[in-house]
Every structure is written in structure tokens, then in C-alpha cells.
């Protein structure tokens, strides 16, 4: 919208993304009550989604090892959205042998499989659709952006962005080290927890407001 406004297009309405709206929850969407009683350091389940871009696989496995070490009381569930390659399967099986609380899920071809994210205390990872799904459920989700889609979602909802790619670059390639990314992620997790997940509370309010705009817009077209 900002781009269009800069081009003097004035008649604009922001209706949000339909995937934000779970019609069974949207009217009362808010931060899930599980965040009132638990913390990330408790014996919870953390879901980590895989990257879409192969060049970000080192980040993914670095993040898995980091989260397992940092939150050793937690169960870790790895979500593979487009299937698991033989190479990834071999790596994941080794990780599962090394870490008894680690498991993995193949979500390819299964929209219903997304419901497994609801078993997690939080989602962290690279998949935009995982991010959007968790937000639609009132779950805390930390997206590591691979492209502009996630950046746009977070800008619209007031959630801080964490990027792993060079901006303004024609070549897609990693731009930060694993250690730097891990530090950024840890600092953000500490921040949102200390603030009582305020960014997410505001984001859910914003989603509800966008939904009301969308309803009015659709009603005006009928």
C-alpha cells in the first residue's frame, strides 16, 4: 500500500491475508492462554520449520543444535513442509539419536498436518506458511525471513523482522554467520518473553481489525 500511495493511488483498503483468518477463532483471536503459565525454558515443545531455500540449510541445522542446547528441557519437533530429502533424513536421524527429545514431521501433502503446530509452545523457523498458520491460532511464531513475503507480513502486523539474506542483492546467498543469527534469535526470544509477548498481543488485535475491514469490503461487493 505504501508503494501505491507514493504513486498517488489514494483509494486503497487493506483487507489482510485470508490465511490469517481461521473463521473458528478470528472473532476472539488472542494470545493463547498457555503463555500465561509457561515459559520457553519450561518443559515445552518447540517447533522448528525447515527453509525453502537450500542455501539456508546450514542456518537450519545450526538453529536446531542451538535451540536443543539452549532449551534442553524442551521437546523439539522439526517440520519439513515439502518432504525430506535423503540427505536431510540421514542428518535428522543422526540428530534424533544424539538428542532424545528431538522428533521430525513430514508435512508434505498434508494441510491437516499443520495442526501439529498447536502442540508447540512456539514456532521458530523459515516457512512463511508456518508463521501465518501459527499466528492465526494465537501461537507465538518467530519467522526467519528468506524473502519479502515474511517481511511484508511482519510489517503489516507490527512484528519484528529477522532476516538471513542480503538486502538489495540480485544474488541470493546467506549474509550472516550462524553465531550472529543465533544471538539475534536468542535476544528476540528473551525480549518477547520479558515484554509479555506484547508484539504478538498487538498483532492479534491488528488481525481482528483487518478481518473486520475485509468483511465490510466483501459485503459492499455483494
PLM region spans:
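Active-site anion-handling motifs in enzyme catalytic cores
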Residues: 1-222
Amino acid at each position: 500500500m505504501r508503494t501505491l500511495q507514493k504513486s498517488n493511488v489514494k483509494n486503497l483498503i487493506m483487507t489482510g491475508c485470508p490465511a490469517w483468518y481461521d473463521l473458528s477463532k478470528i472473532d476472539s483471536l488472542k494470545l493463547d492462554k498457555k503463555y500465561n503459565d509457561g515459559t520457553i525454558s519450561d518443559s515445552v515443545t518447540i517447533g522448528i520449520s525447515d527453509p525453502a531455500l537450500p542455501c539456508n540449510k546450514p542456518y537450519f541445522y545450526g538453529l536446531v543444535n542451538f535451540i536443543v542446547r539452549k532449551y534442553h528441557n524442551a521437546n523439539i519437533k522439526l517440520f519439513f513442509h515439502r518432504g525430506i530429502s535423503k540427505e536431510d533424513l540421514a542428518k535428522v536421524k543422526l540428530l534424533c539419536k544424539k538428542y532424545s527429545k528431538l522428533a521430525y514431521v513430514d508435512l508434505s501433502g498434508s494441510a491437516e498436518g499443520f495442526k501439529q503446530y498447536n502442540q508447540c509452545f512456539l514456532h521458530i523457523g523459515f516457512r512463511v506458511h508456518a508463521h501465518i498458520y501459527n499466528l492465526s491460532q494465537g501461537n507465538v511464531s518467530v519467522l526467519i525471513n528468506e524473502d519479502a513475503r515474511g517481511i511484508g507480513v511482519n510489517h503489516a502486523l507490527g512484528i519484528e523482522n529477522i532476516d538471513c539474506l542480503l538486502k538489495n542483492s540480485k544474488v541470493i546467498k546467506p549474509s550472516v554467520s550462524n553465531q550472529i543469527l543465533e544471538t539475534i534469535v536468542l535476544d528476540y526470544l528473551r525480549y518477547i518473553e520479558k515484554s509479555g509477548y506484547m508484539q504478538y498481543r498487538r498483532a492479534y488485535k491488528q488481525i481482528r481489525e483487518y478481518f473486520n475491514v475485509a468483511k465490510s469490503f466483501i459485503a459492499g461487493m455483494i
